[in-house]
């Protein structure tokens, strides 16, 4: 189930729109998660992964960053990740169409709170049983959900390590892997040249031997 949806400006973490589960008891339970979401918005930056899943006990945060805006949803841990990211991409497309040009100019929190109407409408369509049955038909061409980075929300917030740092570590590992492959290729090339050179020297010595000793 989709329990909380928030949209914020990436540059400063300013909340732009939000929609929370309407049930009052559930709403009180979600205050902690809403606070975590706001902390997360303040940590994100342009170097952060543009798609990420953050585990939070029995819940999971999923977010998408596009065109300077972060779209975040809180779901029960068992809610399909593919469905969650398809939902966020749907919101992203509509929000950018309606408010994209105004995002850099606003200064008040929740300046686009009226977008809640579209959020509620979209949320219902994604939690509908028919939508869940048709999960395999949802268009997720822009991303492979199996390769989206997964982290723990408490570790990220308590450790004080920006998600960009986690992304940098992944990039460093990738760079080291590429360097290893490059070095291995270079060494293999040198080995091949050395073998050819040794063969050439042997051939020349054989010719010299035949010429001076047999001719």
UniProtKB/Swiss-Prot annotation:
CDD domains from the UniProt entry: Longin, R-SNARE_SEC22
Domain Longin residue range list: 6-119
Topology versus the membrane: Single-pass type IV membrane protein
Residue stretches spanning the membrane: 191-213
GO BP annotation list: endoplasmic reticulum to Golgi vesicle-mediated transport; protein transport; retrograde vesicle-mediated transport, Golgi to endoplasmic reticulum; vesicle fusion with Golgi apparatus
Main location: endoplasmic reticulum
GO terms assigned for molecular function: SNAP receptor activity
Oligomer status and interactors: Component of 2 distinct SNARE complexes.
UniProt protein name: Vesicle-trafficking protein SEC22b-B
Organism annotation: Danio rerio (Zebrafish)
């Amino acid at each position: 189930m989709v329990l909380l949806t928030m949209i914020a400006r990436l540059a400063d973490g300013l909340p732009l729109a939000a929609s929370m589960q309407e049930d009052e008891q559930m709403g009180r339970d979600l205050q902690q998660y809403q606070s975590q979401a706001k902390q997360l918005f303040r940590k994100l930056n342009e170097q952060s992964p543009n798609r990420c899943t953050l585990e939070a006990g029995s819940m999971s945060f999923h977010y998408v960053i596009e065109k300077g805006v972060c779209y975040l949803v809180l779901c029960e841990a068992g809610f399909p990740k593919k469905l969650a990211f398809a939902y966020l991409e749907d919101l992203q497309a509509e929000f950018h169409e309606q408010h994209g040009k105004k995002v850099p100019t606003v200064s008040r929190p929740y300046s686009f709170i009226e977008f809640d109407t579209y959020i509620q409408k979209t949320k219902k369509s994604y939690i509908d049983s028919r939508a869940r049955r048709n999960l395999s038909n949802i268009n997720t061409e822009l991303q492979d959900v199996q390769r989206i980075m997964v982290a723990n929300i408490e570790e990220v917030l308590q450790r004080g390590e920006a998600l960009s740092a986690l992304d940098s570590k992944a990039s460093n590992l990738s760079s080291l892997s590429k360097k290893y492959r490059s070095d291995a290729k270079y060494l293999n090339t040198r080995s091949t040249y050395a073998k050819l050179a040794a063969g050439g020297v042997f051939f020349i010595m054989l010719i010299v031997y035949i010429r001076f000793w047999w001719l």
